[in-house]
Amino acid sequence: MAEKAIRLGGESTADAIVSAVDSLYPEHTFEDKEFALKHNDDEIAVDTNFAAQSFWKDAILRFFGKRSAVLGLILIVVIVLLAVFGPGMNSYTYSGQDLSQKNFAPRVPGIERLGILDGSEKMSTTTGSKSVNAYVEKGKDDVYYWFGSDLYGRDIWTRTWEGARVSLIIAVAAAVIDMVIGMSYGLISGYFGGRVDMVMQRFLEVANGIPRLVIVTLLLLVLQPGMVTIIFALMLTEWVGMSRIARAEMLKLKDQEFVLASRTLGAGSFFIIFKEVLPNIIGPIITQVMFSIPTAIFTEAFLSFVGLGIPVPQCSLGSWISELYNSFTTHPYQIIPPIVVMSLLMLSFNLVADGLREALDPKMKSM
């Protein structure tokens, strides 16, 4: 056997095994296929409690396990669908006026038979209050305003959802632009460090110290007021918070092993920043974007309310609320729809952002 072992040393491992077995069992000829590895997955014990699961799959499951986040997501989907299709669900346009049908109360076909939303409203008089139905008084039996009409005979339903569409476009566009600018600025500042970081952070402090209202006012003096001007104004101020988050994440990751390995292999700075580090901080970035959208909605509404927003006949939720504010004491039902829509929109984005923060943060996994 010793001689055979020495003789087998020059052969390949597989041939050596076959030769050794043949020498032990000369009466039987073994084929190579008899030495093939047979797989039987049924006999392999797998611990399902600790089975491998991707980060994003786990984050999605945790997000949908939070009821408030799911509720916020449903509200966002419903409002977005109504903002897209709502203005076309009746025959009115957002800019159309009919002074003969001004200040009509809400009236919905079918529901009016129940005695609610039938076009009647209570009016205060010197002797008390009485119920008035403008549809009946003016012979408009075939006219329906689901949310009522305003002082100029414009459909509140159509203008509310048109305003929601404009507000969403402004908020989402501003948030995405803020993400791109702030994320790039913060990653570059944190990666290079030293004097580069010091100069960039001083510029950041100066930009953050300029009041937003001053920037918007100056822009309105130079540019035409409108959607692009508001987006540009929000872009110039809201990216600061995003850059600080990106810089903080970069400072935590730039000395990690995977970054050092890429540097050792000769990868360039921008490859490391945007190919290696960026995918690992996308969770906090997405969360910050979701939090910045309701902030942009509120800022746009505030600017429109003080007369620095969307010019008529266009409308956003803020400018629409500003227009209806003058009729609040006489026709309070007019201002309720845009206020409710804007409140639900801001609440739903905050709920989704809070759910994403918990789902994408590994530190909160056990909470």
Model regions and ranges:
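Alpha-helical transmembrane segments of integral membrane proteins
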Residues: 149-367
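Gly/Trp-centered helix-boundary motif
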Residues: 1-179, 183, 324-348, 352, ...
